[in-house]
Amino acid sequence: MNLVFSFDEGYAEVFKVLLHSLYLNNKETRFNIYLLHDEMLSEALEDLQRHIEYYKYNFFPIDCRKYLEESENFRINRYYTIEMYLWLFAPYLLPKEVDRALYLDADIVNMNSVKDFYSQDFEDRLFVAMDYKIKNQIIQPFNNLRLRTKDADNYFNTGIVLMNIQKLREERTAKEISEAVVDNKAILILPDQDVFNYLYHDEIKENSWEIYNVDPRLYQVFQLINPETYNLGWVEDEVVFIHFAGKHKPWVEREKYKWDLGKYYFEFEKMLMDTYTERESDRIDGRTF
């Protein structure tokens, strides 16, 4: 199973929590981890490799600098870096034998098996993604005007995206992504997400955000309205991914993080920390990980 990530050194520790949650909920799966990066420090890559190989997964870091010679044109403002765009180029950067891949933001935890989501039929679409309709419906006309997608009914989130790599290679190009970024720089608000919707809005299969891309803020609203359905038992039994989108992050705010689903980040983080203790004991005993 092919997983694609794109982040800088600042998100390495958060990624490790996601990785541990994937391991715990997919024990029978061996992941190929592709990290698209922009000249990440060798020490950081070596550290990631040790952690990934602990789970017996394959790690393939891909330095994308040479593919983005005019990368300064991609920078929107100080909050967004080139790594935000790299996943869009995955079809043209991954090995030719890869025919599908799941892109994940690092600010996620996995709650249940990803097998069904990953192996689903694309139904001749380029992607599978989720739209927070309840949040986006008010601003959909504005997004359509801004991105010139007048017929679009959706504005898809790009935190979790299943990619039809083979079809993308056959039908689309990397050049159109670069041109979309540079030509629309003045109107991009959520850069990679805007470009994704601008280019592909009518070629995306929609899945339910309530299962595959739960936003803790929206969950809190639904839980207040219908607590019999939306509760932590439902989250633990049904939800596949919790996505800590937005500016407020549990690993930054710690005990001040106010959304209930932050508890799962802290639980997976603690379980990861416990493995560090075990690994250190193994090292002292002469075993390696």
Predicted regions and their residues:
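Active-site-proximal specificity loops/subdomain of glycosyltransferases
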Residues: 50-93
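Short internal beta-strands
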Residues: 32-39, 129-131
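Short, acidic, metal-binding catalytic loop of nucleotide-sugar glycosyltransferases
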Residues: 21-29
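A glycosyltransferase accessory/donor-loop signature
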Residues: 1, 7, 14-17, 165-289
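Short aromatic/hydrophobic "clamp" motif used to bind/position activated sugar donors
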Residues: 101
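A recurrent flexible, glycine/aromatic-enriched loop bordering the glycosyltransferase active site
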Residues: 149-160
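Catalytic metal- and UDP-sugar-binding loop of GT-A-like glycosyltransferases, i.e.
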Residues: 104
